[in-house]
Amino acid sequence: MAGPSTTSNAPKQRKRVEAETSSNTSTTLRRAKDGSAFALCEGCNKSVAVALISMHNCSLDAKIRVNLEAQVVETQAEAKKKPAEKKKTTSDGPKPKRLKKTNDEKKSSSTSNKPKRPLTAFFIFMSDFRKTFKSEHNGSLAKDAAKIGGEKWKSLTEEEKKVYLDKAAELKAEYNKSLESNDADEEEEDEEKQSDDVDDAEEKQVDDDDEVEEKEVENTDDDKKEAEGKEEEEEEILDDY
């Protein structure tokens, strides 16, 4: 039998790698003359890290700073707009209470000079019907009166409705007359206001003219005083000679 081969079992040669010594791996720390890690740039008078001083560029930094300042100004302006709009709602002080209108003020504001619209024939009928319905049916609901009254109005003949139609026509005629008189009164008030405005404008113009005349008189008086002063100075000079 052949013996085992020595080449297959021979150990492999390992490469020897030399480790770097401390002299090779030692890093030099950059420092300023005074030992500080920052140095003052003579161009822009800024403190720059000594390790990054080779990448420092004054003109480039100035451009970046200008762009950043512009962006900051824009963002601040946009941020200021929102609080200004919400200033009323975010106030710390107590909100002023709204003055409630009295009943008289409400009536005066709601009721204008115009007359109320006249009732129609159906509503005139219903006002009479409710009176009789309440007297005949005690404790009944208003809904029942309206329902029964509407049915009864439909069942009436034209002759029976004529009484209410005539009343409605009379009320409408009175309403139209009152509207015409009201319009005439409003026109008179407008004319009076216009005349008052014209009078006020004329009075203002007269006052302005008076002020102009007073200023002119004051100016002429000042001119006279200056002329008299010059004459006195000339007389004094002649007396000296």
From Swiss-Prot:
UniProt cross-references to InterPro entries, sorted A to Z: HMG_box_dom, HMG_box_dom_sf
Compartments, record wording: Nucleus
Chief place of localization: nucleus
Pfam families: HMG_box (PF00505)
Expression sites by tissue: Expressed at low levels in lateral roots, root tips, cotyledons, leaves and flowers (including pedicels, but excluding styles).
Inactivation phenotype: Failure of fusion of the polar nuclei during megagametogenesis.
Description of post-translational modifications: Phosphorylated.
Molecular functions per Gene Ontology: DNA binding; DNA-binding transcription factor activity
Regions of compositional bias (Acidic residues) in chain numbering: 182-221, 229-241
Region: Disordered, residue numbers: 1-30, 75-116, 174-241
Basic and acidic residues composition-biased segments: 77-90
DNA-binding region positions on the chain: 115-183
Cystine crosslinks: none
GO biological process, one term: karyogamy
Function of the molecule: Binds preferentially double-stranded supercoiled DNA. Required for karyogamy during female gametophyte development, when the two polar nuclei fuse to form the diploid central cell nucleus.
Family, similarity comment: Belongs to the HMGB family.
UniProt protein name: High mobility group B protein 7
Record lineage: Eukaryota, Viridiplantae, Streptophyta, Embryophyta, Tracheophyta
Gene this protein is translated from: HMGB7
